Amino acid sequence: MLAFLNCEHINKLLDKLDLINHSFDKRINLDKVKKAIFYAKKYHSNQKRDTGEPYYMHPLEVALMVADYSFKTDTIITAILHDTIEDTTLTKEKIAIEFNDNIAEQVLALTRNRGGKKTSSIKMIKTLVNQDKVELLLIKLLDRLDNIKTIFIKPVKRRQEIILETQQEFIPLAEYLKLPEIAIKLNKYCERYAT
């Protein structure tokens, strides 16, 4: 498994979490995080992003950003696994067995495609706000921040839809979470790719 975990994105995340553990006397369980990375890399192994990069790099980047705001092992693992139920053969049941029920429930809560039906981002955000799932809202927000960085590859019509959704749903979410720095970044990407 150690060779499987050897890459720049993985090392960057693990180094950051190790630093958090030492600097803030936190106890992020690095063994569990490594296991989650292994699962993300394994289950996303045949997937590529629109940029051509291996897909697993996206959830690692989301987890890296999440670690700026949350020092909880379950939250970081949820960020790493956030697309697995939706985009791979990994199931909620398998996640519960390998990690715990909380992580499995959180990954499921972030899954938009269920039973052939896709939930809109705004509906998911409203549900998570009503349930006071701040950590999951954070993951959802940072997922959008990482995804919007590559919308230049999308067709113009799809790009415009993503920008509008970001302006109407995710910038207000950043403000709701009291993360003005994220709102500013999202707005800059929207402006950059608007034309």
Predicted regions and their residues:
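Active-site helical microenvironments for divalent-metal-assisted chemistry
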Residues: 1-195
